């Protein structure tokens, strides 16, 4: 009888836990995805803060030339970064227990791999948690779909690109200047500026910013005034009110006359879908571009594509970009190799004929 009571009590505790996890009445929804999201993001955040402050230099290129990234080793907020895991480790799974000592783990950049893998798992669970909460509330799933764009972008630079290049040392450093360095080296090695998917991503991000500013300014300019001239127009809105807060007909008429009639939306739902879809699709394409360039399917190469009647090259902007790429490639990892990879790959002529 005692055993039966204990089993019922344990089932009751489990049931209460399940109800609490999935309850939409909590101040912050947890959900089953949140059970995994919370510890992974806490781990990634904690290790990032500690490593950014105090991690020792990391042998990123695997040539016994450590690079300092933490504040206590001479960096500031701008120059500081979590240095990627050493090229000597490559793509190996490198937890603390795989190293001979903590010092070795730190020297080989173990914190980077720990942070990145926990972070990617955490943000993927955050996306799942968005879907889960939408499902519980009877909402459509588009919030999670929109969030999939930055998740895909992060996965591309932190996981797919290192896999394609063969080492976590090629991943994006976790810092401001490290991000810029990653971008410059990426351009040098893959000519990303000439890749159509990157162009679509630029159109998505800048276009999304433009459309957001246009929409916000149109709405703000066509508010239905509920207050006097001496009060803020914002005071005329009450949370949950059924009435429209702005005159979409006026906004539609203004924009239609400013550009042309069919440039303006007359359906609020299709308008907001467009505002969400434009940047999301653009960032999806950017992530896809990074993922293809990870395996060296690079941007277009129009070098020396224009010649005169004598066969002399007429330089185009593509040739200027190529010259800049060579300069950037020469300068990065300058002690790891003597020549840019594309120059070193040229077949050497035979001396003996």
From Swiss-Prot:
Propeptide residues, chain positions: 345-353
Residues engaged in binding chlorophyll a PD1: 198
Marked site: Stabilizes free radical intermediate: 190
Residues recorded as bearing N-acetylthreonine in the entry: 2
Binding sites annotated in the UniProt record for pheophytin a: 126
GO annotation, biological process: photosynthetic electron transport in photosystem II; response to herbicide
CDD domains: Photosystem-II_D1
Subcellular location: Plastid, Chloroplast thylakoid membrane
Alphabetized Pfam families for the sequence: Photo_RC (PF00124)
Residue sites binding chlorophyll a ChlzD1 per the record: 118
EC number: 1.10.3.9
Residues annotated for Fe cation binding in this entry: 215, 272
Site (Tyrosine radical intermediate): 161
Disulfide bonds: none
Record's bilayer topology term: Multi-pass membrane protein
Domain of life: Eukaryota
Record family assignment: Belongs to the reaction center PufL/M/PsbA/D family.
Subunit structure: PSII is composed of 1 copy each of membrane proteins PsbA, PsbB, PsbC, PsbD, PsbE, PsbF, PsbH, PsbI, PsbJ, PsbK, PsbL, PsbM, PsbT, PsbX, PsbY, PsbZ, Psb30/Ycf12, at least 3 peripheral proteins of the oxygen-evolving complex and a large number of cofactors. It forms dimeric complexes.
Function per UniProt: Photosystem II (PSII) is a light-driven water:plastoquinone oxidoreductase that uses light energy to abstract electrons from H(2)O, generating O(2) and a proton gradient subsequently used for ATP formation. It consists of a core antenna complex that captures photons, and an electron transfer chain that converts photonic excitation into a charge separation. The D1/D2 (PsbA/PsbD) reaction center heterodimer binds P680, the primary electron donor of PSII as well as several subsequent electron acceptors.
Extra remark beyond the main annotation: 2 of the reaction center chlorophylls (ChlD1 and ChlD2) are entirely coordinated by water.
Name used for this protein in its record: Photosystem II protein D1
Species in which this protein is naturally found: Cucumis sativus
